Amino acid sequence: MTKLIAPSEIVGGVPVFKPTYEQFEDFYAYCKAINKYGMKSGVVKVIPPKEWKDKLDLPYSAETLQKIKIKSPIQQHISGNKGLFMVQNVEKNKTYNIIQWKDLSKDYVPPEDPKARRNSRKGSVSKSTKLKLKNFESSFNIDDFEQFRTEYTIDLSDFQNTERLKFLEEYYWKTLNFTTPMYGADTPGSIFPEGLNVWNVAKLPNILDHMETKVPGVNDSYLYAGLWKASFSWHLEDQDLYSINYIHFGAPKQWYSIPQEDRFKFYKFMQEQFPEEAKNCPEFLRHKMFLASPKLLQENGIRCNEIVHHEGEFMITYPYGYHAGFNYGYNLAESVNFALEEWLPIGKKAGKCHCISDSVEIDVKKLAKSWRDNNKESKGTPPLNQLPNPAMPLLHRPTLKEMESSSLRSTSPDVGHFSNFKSKSSGVSSPLLSRMKDYSNIVEPTLEDPTLKLKRISSFQEQPLNKLLKRETSQTAMLTDHEDNIVAMSLTSMANSAASSPRLPLSRLNSSNELSNAQPLLDMTNNTLAFPRPNGPSGLNPLLYISNKNISGISHSAPHSPVNPNISLIKRVKSPNIVTLNISRESSRSPIALNYEARQQHSQQHSFSTPSTVSNLSTSVLGPLSDTNDIKTPHPERPNHKTANRILKKESPVETSKSNLILSKVASTRQEDSFTSRNDDLDKEQGSSPLNSKFAPEEIVLSGKNKIYICKECQRKFSSGHHLTRHKKSVHSGEKPHSCPKCGKRFKRRDHVLQHLNKKIPCISNETTVDAPIMNPTVQPQDGKAAINQQSTPLN
């Protein structure tokens, strides 16, 4: 039901609805139809139709009356005056049944109106007996409740007189702090017939039905046993929920409500009246301790609606609608919270009082998801499999034909996404899609430059799928232009955390390195290459780095995708839109020439393997990055051992042979001959041409078998080039204008100099610097395998 239903009348600013049974039988739809009015007035009254009342078990059976238990009622100690009161609720450690509660009500009788005629009185009011002192269980049997069926309610004729009610209301506010009312509040239970499914407070259809647990009073009903003056203070419902209250029998309730438009004004007023409580807790009104008379509120420009709630009627409270009230006498009501769809955004930002241990907190996001998943009529977001492809293009899987006709980009999915049809991608859980989206926002490489265009594998589509999975090759023409090479990065392997360390070096493609490939490639014309999809794990990188250098006379192997692509994150050269992006913990280091980075890649050894077969390592000519010849890598079947040897400067072929000797010790015995002979050829080709170094010749001094690195600026000595680099950036960098007066170390900010001087270990001045011993790198065999240990510390 989406049609708006207007109220039958408005009483004291409160809309009153009198629905037909057809309107009334759908609770959720009817509440949505009247929601507009309740969100303005704070509360509404709903008078149920006669057809619904006929379904109730009236008068209530003895069994129903017997199960009513009022546990630990509260005594309300009220202090204050002039319309402002504070309520302290003290629990009474006793349980009453309904027979005892009615007997107790004789001690809480509303006063007689002195203006009423004496002959209108029906006799003196009887006092309570000792019945209330008996044990609520052992002293009563089913026969007692059967007899009580005819007297469980009271004479309500006095409460039909509006003048009488007005007198009692005024009397209540004048004498509120004279007595201590008793209220049987928050007692779990329900006395609605179990077979009643229409407007049964114990089982109202609403969003809270999808909560995983039952919370008393929230999605599990409470019984409220009232007596004269028993009050409920100004408050909002827990988590700003809706609530519904139904009086089963007895005296009426007086309700007050603040229109939602005045809620901020009301809160500010109460904050001013109770400053200490408001200071200690911003949600102090949720404590249900503060009362302000409607007269006082109206005098301060705050509208206050009021209405009388009679037996057999419903009152509904709304989010942001502050409400309060009291009972005119003995009665029994039932109440519970509920929620409509309109409440979801309200509940997400609702305040919560942390002063009360049992305050309610609902996971609204989880509740909304559970409700939408289980509600077939929900207008929420459709499932992912129902979304059209344009809505989420990342979830669209192109066909092989589409892939062949599309442009190759660094953000393109790998071949495995097209050929492995057993895998499914998810827009929620796939790290590939999320990372592709993140990186595409950082770098947007393009291939529109004519020097970067590639020819596609013409026979790719003709290859059977099983050939791709078996790493079979084909003869294809990949590149024709003799241009500088392009380095592309596969975001697939980055999503699989394979490229999380971008400082690892990349072996070059199109190299004559037999050890870097596991399988020889068939002889091909024009020296062209094809890169098939390996059948290794998903972490393999399917997009390899392609060179457009034609090297004649060299037999190539089909390289397989390495597990870890060892390359800085993105590097593109010889292009109008050059992109250089390096995400690394070393990104703060001073700039280093690309030639040095390229050479550093050759001095480190890496091994890539798959669960079933050995992954191959492929290399490519680095073009303008370096003109250095290839340096062999160990066979990937062997365990990987990093060497501490760094080629800083090649003075002569003798030094190169020493370097090769160290590398040959790291390699396996089976590869030693091939590895050494290969590097001997390299020495012959290079002759004595020195390698460009990061350090100047005067910065490196050979002392026996050790190298000492000397700073040209301050002549300080270091045991490793790494420490010298850090020293130059720290001390002699122009970016740090403030220096230490003792040691000369430089800082970006003056306060950093003070922190440096106040260290527990004082710095040493340049004049008193003493050279510390330098640890030598030693080669120690461990379990028959070469292992190089190096300890280096700065001399300062």
From Swiss-Prot:
<feature type="region of interest" description="Disordered">
    <location>
        <begin position="599"/>
        <end position="692"/>
    </location>
</feature>
<keyword id="KW-0805">Transcription regulation</keyword>
<feature type="modified residue" description="Phosphoserine">
    <location>
        <position position="459"/>
    </location>
</feature>
<dbReference type="GO" id="GO:0051864">
    <property type="term" value="F:histone H3K36 demethylase activity"/>
</dbReference>
<feature type="compositionally biased region" description="Polar residues">
    <location>
        <begin position="601"/>
        <end position="621"/>
    </location>
</feature>
<dbReference type="GO" id="GO:0032454">
    <property type="term" value="F:histone H3K9 demethylase activity"/>
</dbReference>
<feature type="region of interest" description="Disordered">
    <location>
        <begin position="774"/>
        <end position="796"/>
    </location>
</feature>
<feature type="zinc finger region" description="C2H2-type 1">
    <location>
        <begin position="709"/>
        <end position="732"/>
    </location>
</feature>
<keyword id="KW-0479">Metal-binding</keyword>
<comment type="function">
    <text>Transcriptional repressor of photolyase PHR1. Recognizes and binds the sequence AG(4) in the upstream repressing sequence of PHR1. Derepresses PHR1 transcription when phosphorylated.</text>
</comment>
<dbReference type="InterPro" id="IPR003347">
    <property type="entry name" value="JmjC_dom"/>
</dbReference>
<feature type="modified residue" description="Phosphoserine">
    <location>
        <position position="557"/>
    </location>
</feature>
<dbReference type="GO" id="GO:0008270">
    <property type="term" value="F:zinc ion binding"/>
</dbReference>
<keyword id="KW-0678">Repressor</keyword>
<dbReference type="Pfam" id="PF00096">
    <property type="entry name" value="zf-C2H2"/>
</dbReference>
<dbReference type="GO" id="GO:0006338">
    <property type="term" value="P:chromatin remodeling"/>
</dbReference>
<keyword id="KW-0863">Zinc-finger</keyword>
<keyword id="KW-0862">Zinc</keyword>
<dbReference type="GO" id="GO:0000122">
    <property type="term" value="P:negative regulation of transcription by RNA polymerase II"/>
</dbReference>
<feature type="modified residue" description="Phosphoserine">
    <location>
        <position position="584"/>
    </location>
</feature>
<feature type="compositionally biased region" description="Polar residues">
    <location>
        <begin position="654"/>
        <end position="669"/>
    </location>
</feature>
<feature type="zinc finger region" description="C2H2-type 2; atypical">
    <location>
        <begin position="738"/>
        <end position="763"/>
    </location>
</feature>
<keyword id="KW-0677">Repeat</keyword>
<dbReference type="GO" id="GO:0001227">
    <property type="term" value="F:DNA-binding transcription repressor activity, RNA polymerase II-specific"/>
</dbReference>
<feature type="modified residue" description="Phosphoserine">
    <location>
        <position position="430"/>
    </location>
</feature>
<feature type="domain" description="JmjN">
    <location>
        <begin position="14"/>
        <end position="55"/>
    </location>
</feature>
<dbReference type="Pfam" id="PF02373">
    <property type="entry name" value="JmjC"/>
</dbReference>
<keyword id="KW-0804">Transcription</keyword>
<dbReference type="GO" id="GO:0005634">
    <property type="term" value="C:nucleus"/>
</dbReference>
<dbReference type="InterPro" id="IPR013087">
    <property type="entry name" value="Znf_C2H2_type"/>
</dbReference>
<feature type="modified residue" description="Phosphoserine">
    <location>
        <position position="561"/>
    </location>
</feature>
<feature type="modified residue" description="Phosphoserine">
    <location>
        <position position="652"/>
    </location>
</feature>
<keyword id="KW-0597">Phosphoprotein</keyword>
<dbReference type="GO" id="GO:0010468">
    <property type="term" value="P:regulation of gene expression"/>
</dbReference>
<dbReference type="InterPro" id="IPR036236">
    <property type="entry name" value="Znf_C2H2_sf"/>
</dbReference>
<feature type="short sequence motif" description="Bipartite nuclear localization signal">
    <location>
        <begin position="455"/>
        <end position="471"/>
    </location>
</feature>
<protein>
    <recommendedName>
        <fullName>DNA damage-responsive transcriptional repressor RPH1</fullName>
    </recommendedName>
</protein>
<dbReference type="GO" id="GO:0032968">
    <property type="term" value="P:positive regulation of transcription elongation by RNA polymerase II"/>
</dbReference>
<dbReference type="GO" id="GO:0010507">
    <property type="term" value="P:negative regulation of autophagy"/>
</dbReference>
<feature type="domain" description="JmjC">
    <location>
        <begin position="193"/>
        <end position="355"/>
    </location>
</feature>
<feature type="modified residue" description="Phosphoserine">
    <location>
        <position position="575"/>
    </location>
</feature>
<feature type="modified residue" description="Phosphothreonine">
    <location>
        <position position="399"/>
    </location>
</feature>
